[in-house]
Design a protein with these regions (language model features):
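Short, small-residue-biased leader/transition segments that mark boundaries at the very start
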Residues: 1-3
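Glycine-/charge-enriched secondary-structure boundary and capping motifs
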Residues: 19-38, 42, 46-61, 108-186
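A glycine- and small/hydrophobic-rich beta-loop-beta segment
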Residues: 80, 85-118
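Acidic/histidine-enriched ion/cofactor-binding microenvironments in catalytic or ligand-binding pockets
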Residues: 55-60, 70-89
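A general structural motif
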Residues: 64-70, 93-103, 142-145
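Glycine- and other small-residue-rich loops at beta-strand/loop junctions that grip anionic moieties
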Residues: 52, 64, 78, 95, ...
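Conserved structured catalytic cores and adjacent interaction surfaces
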Residues: 6, 10, 42
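Catalytic palm subdomain of template-directed nucleic-acid polymerases
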Residues: 9-22
């Protein structure tokens, strides 16, 4: 069963209504996400006293989530071998049905041994993921000439997958190569 925990830090509330609205909006958004994804926040720490003398902390809501599973089904992010297909799985992050369908499809592909590494995209987008996935085993990437995605765009909820075969999931970005390079002609 999946669950999460929340910890929030917010500036001194005072009498400014907008300051009171920030924690309300953040926690309402967290509740919406929990309901949409069928995940409960089973605990939390109230750190709303995020102040020191006259200083305020930036408004922050942290979520810690777990999804217990079998150790044999856990994969790491580094590329495993040259000659594998690299695919990008993404969708509108506000479409929770599509998001959970993607996650379920990726989990099935992992269980079938077709996905051997994965990277959740961050602020640096596809380019960051490809670079960091290659570091561990010094395996490179050759991006397909016809890949037309933005290499640096932030894509919330998207994942790069290293596949042992070219599966029908997401879009193909390229292939892993034995040289530790990041090649793109496009």
């Amino acid at each position: 069963r999946r669950s999460s925990d929340l910890q929030e830090y917010f500036e001194r509330m005072g009498t400014d209504p907008t300051r009171w609205g920030k924690p309300f909006a953040a926690l309402l958004g967290a509740l919406d996400a929990q309901l949409d994804l069928n995940i409960a926040a089973i605990g939390g720490k109230d750190s709303m006293s995020g102040t020191f003398e006259k200083m305020d902390v930036p408004p922050t809501l942290c979520s810690f989530a777990i999804a217990p599973g079998k150790a044999s089904e856990v994969i790491s992010p580094e590329f495993k071998e040259a000659g594998h297909a690299i695919r990008l799985v993404s969708c509108d992050p506000h479409d929770t049905a599509a998001l959970t369908a993607n996650y379920d499809a990726v989990l099935s592909a992992i269980r079938a041994g077709k996905v051997v590494s994965a990277w959740a995209l961050g602020l640096g987008g596809v380019a960051e993921g490809l670079f960091k996935m290659g570091i561990g085993n010094q395996i490179g990437t050759r991006i397909d000439d016809d890949y037309d995605g933005n290499l640096f765009a932030q894509q919330i909820g998207a994942m790069l997958l290293e596949c042992t075969e070219d599966i029908d999931l997401g879009v193909k970005v390229g292939d892993t190569v034995p040289e530790w390079v990041l090649e793109y002609e496009g």
